[in-house]
Regions:
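Flexible, glycine-rich linker and terminal segments associated
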Residues: 144-146, 151-161, 165, 169-171, ...
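Outer-membrane beta-barrel translocator/channel fold
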Residues: 29, 49-77, 81, 87, ...
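Transmembrane beta-barrel domains of Gram-negative outer membranes and organellar outer membranes
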Residues: 1-104, 116-117, 129, 161, ...
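Outer-envelope beta-barrel architecture signal
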Residues: 18-22, 33, 43-45, 88-92, ...
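Short, aliphatic-rich beta-strand segments
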Residues: 22-24, 296-304
């Protein structure tokens, strides 16, 4: 579909992509250009984010503000499957287009699809943009008179869901057919659309026909489209598709240890420890920090650095231990730590593991031979790491980007983030980071602070000042103390330059049982705003900010996590921040967040409230060797001052990820 998502040309269908599918799309339709990303988050839900370039209008009439850039607009679509197609009944879906912005293409629709051989037939009713033909009576108008007229414009400062507009006003019929040719890569589409183009943001457009036709050609993961619309306009487009469940990377890796022909040590004294430790690193990705071995039990304290899948990591390590340790040892303990704070004990039944790993039982199930538990107090006391202090230095690239700016649609900054630190003991360390800008086009900024009247303190809208102060910028410099409070409780205290725009002191406590679907934490912080003129100094603005946060992985929505944080934000507004994340089989995580506070849409300004999206991608999808770690790419349509949280450099939910993994 031209605007993104599964559809014909201008009209959606009730069809869905396979779960986990992601498509990146570009279409050119004369007066409009569309850039969009569509995702199939669940089998029954499709979502699309879109930028529209209105080529017949300027971004603004002020040349010093936006020059000759054409008007850009953001839009969000969502579609839900209500009924899955059967032999006799069609697929039925309900959808909302451009429901969370300025409403350029705001529409609601319900449609049905039925396949018959190589043909796929579609029919639907549309309201809003899809209903401007007004060729049938709005069925809801018969129920309540308020549905007969659709309100104009949008509420607040844009960015809000105008639910009061839903299914109101003119209604039109739309539909079409898709024909899959005998050539698998080629399909034809024809549709009757419901819009009359008399109310478009590009101006009143000529429509010689309601019929649109065209072809789709697929080459590998690309779709190329060519169409003829409105009886007078040629359009074209290209889409790239992948599946976030099935995407993989070929790995060059050592095979897991073969234990069928293994010759374990006769007793503890004869263990070849050098070979054991080397194998744990090279084949198991497990770096040892301390070991306690007796006649019945072996405990290995360390950290997994290569394999993000917990079962793969455990079974690789288990095979090595079963190959090297004497059979008199009945239990292996793989105790993992984060920053020398114990997090998790994976207990392996040695005899059962050997039997299942060598297929000596009728129905082997290796995962049933081990369990994950919290480290005991005895293990905490016995843990004597070979190194508790020392320095480190690391560097990585950073990429900052911004879409839809008045100066230029796409602004970017590329650089190197250099991080250094020193650990004094298990609990305490100091850390800092410096940004070095290598390449950017932020010099295109026509203004550093917008001219809107600031009702709230400018806690984020001065961001342009902070990112343009020079080639080298001190990003953070802070000290942190982290420790285990009790079996399922952790705490930390920190202070310093905590993020680019704020410094201060704070603390956090987190309750997180092993493999629990629930976690709960509280953080409290006192911060001052850093000076963008001298990053070592502060402005006068200060605030207390903190949240009570609940994390929940609901059983009825597999591979998802919901985070709800209630408290006070940086601008001293109060409310909640809600974050919803979905994980796919490849490890890719897609999420969305929004803040709802006691600040009105008018006080907040453009966008009405803080919201954003992100995608988190594991590094091992890009490299040939197994690797942990990931990169995150956020997209915040409008960032103003309300509903903004402190970006704390150390967060216990990340530190304790081992205890109930969601990201890894």
């Amino acid at each position: 579909m031209v605007q993104g998502g599964v559809g014909l040309w201008q009209t959606p269908t009730s069809r869905m992509m396979p779960e986990g599918a992601l498509s990146i799309n570009y279409t050119d339709n004369n007066e409009y250009r569309f850039w969009s990303v569509s995702m199939q988050l669940f089998p029954w839900m499709e979502a699309t984010a879109r930028y529209t370039d209105v080529r017949t209008r300027l971004y603004s009439q002020v040349d010093s503000f936006s020059g000759d850039q054409t008007l850009k607009d953001k839009g969000l679509d969502v579609k839900f499957r209500l009924w899955e197609e059967s032999y006799y009944l069609p697929n039925i879906s309900l959808g909302f287009r451009d429901f969370g912005g300025t409403g350029f293409f705001e529409s609601e629709f319900i449609n049905a699809s039925k396949s018959v051989g190589p043909f796929d037939f579609h029919v639907g009713l549309g309201w809003g943009y899809l209903g401007h033909q007004n060729d049938i009576t709005n069925p809801f108008c018969e129920v309540r008179e308020s549905f007969c007229t659709r309100p104009e414009g949008f509420s607040g400062r844009g960015g809000k869901v105008d639910y009061q507009n839903f299914f109101k006003g003119p209604t039109a019929f739309f539909g079409g057919v898709e024909y899959q040719t005998p050539w698998p890569n080629l399909a034809f589409k024809a549709e009757l659309e419901g819009n009359n183009y008399q109310y478009d943001r590009a101006g009143r457009l000529e429509q010689d026909s309601r019929w649109n036709i065209g072809a789709v050609y697929r080459w590998n993961d690309f779709d190329f489209t060519l169409n003829y619309q409105r009886g007078n306009t040629i359009g074209f487009g290209v889409s790239y598709s992948l599946n976030m469940n099935s995407i993989t990377q070929v790995k060059v890796d050592r095979a897991p240890r073969d234990i069928v022909n293994a010759k374990p040590s006769a007793d503890v004294a004869s263990i070849n420890r050098k070979r054991l430790y080397n194998d744990l690193v090279r084949r198991g990705g497990y770096f040892i920090n301390d070991t306690v071995i007796d006649d019945k039990q072996a405990t290995f304290y360390g950290s997994q650095t290569s394999y993000r899948n917990a079962d793969e990591a455990t079974q690789r390590v288990g095979r090595i231990l079963a190959s090297e340790l004497p059979e008199s040892i009945t239990e292996y303990h793989i105790v993992e730590h984060q920053g020398n704070i114990l997090m998790l004990d994976t207990v392996i039944d040695a005899k059962a593991f050997r039997e299942h790993a060598t297929y000596s039982v009728p129905e082997p199930d290796i995962a049933s031979t081990y369990k994950r538990v919290a480290p005991t107090d005895e293990q905490v006391e016995a843990f004597a790491p070979n190194r508790t202090s020392g320095a480190f230095l690391s560097s990585k690239f950073f990429w900052t980007q911004s879409f839809g700016n008045p100066e230029d649609f796409y602004l970017y900054q590329l650089g190197i983030l250099t991080t250094a630190g020193y650990k004094f003991n298990r609990q305490f360390g100091v850390f800092g980071s410096v940004r070095t800008t290598l390449l950017d086009n932020f010099d295109k900024f026509n203004y550093k602070v917008d001219k809107e009247r600031a009702v709230l303190p400018r806690v984020r809208t001065q961001v342009r000042e902070y990112v343009t102060q020079g080639t080298f910028t001190m990003d953070t410099a802070y000290a942190v103390w982290t420790d285990r409070l009790a079996e399922d409780w952790y705490y930390q205290a920190y202070g310093g330059y905590l993020e680019t725009m704020f410094g201060g002191v704070g603390g956090e406590v987190l309750y997180r049982p092993v493999d629990s679907r629930f976690a709960f934490g509280v953080d409290v912080n006192y911060v001052k705003q850093r000076s963008f003129e001298d990053m070592t100094r502060f402005f006068d603005y200060e605030a207390f900010t903190g949240f009570a946060t609940a994390y929940w992985q609901p059983e009825f929505l597999p591979d998802t996590r919901i985070k709800v944080a209630a408290g006070q934000f940086l601008a001293k507004d109060r409310g909640v921040n809600i974050d919803f994340a979905k994980r796919f089989d490849s490890g890719i995580v897609v999420g969305a967040f929004a803040s709802f506070t006691n600040v009105s849409a008018e006080e907040y300004g453009e966008g009405s409230f803080t919201k954003g999206f992100y995608i988190s991608i594991p590094f091992d999808l890009f490299v040939l060797k197994p690797a942990k770690g990931r990169g995150q790419f956020p997209w915040v349509p409008i960032a103003r001052d309300g509903g903004q949280m402190l970006t704390r450099p150390s967060q216990l939910i990340s530190t304790t990820e081992l205890r109930s993994p969601f990201y890894d």
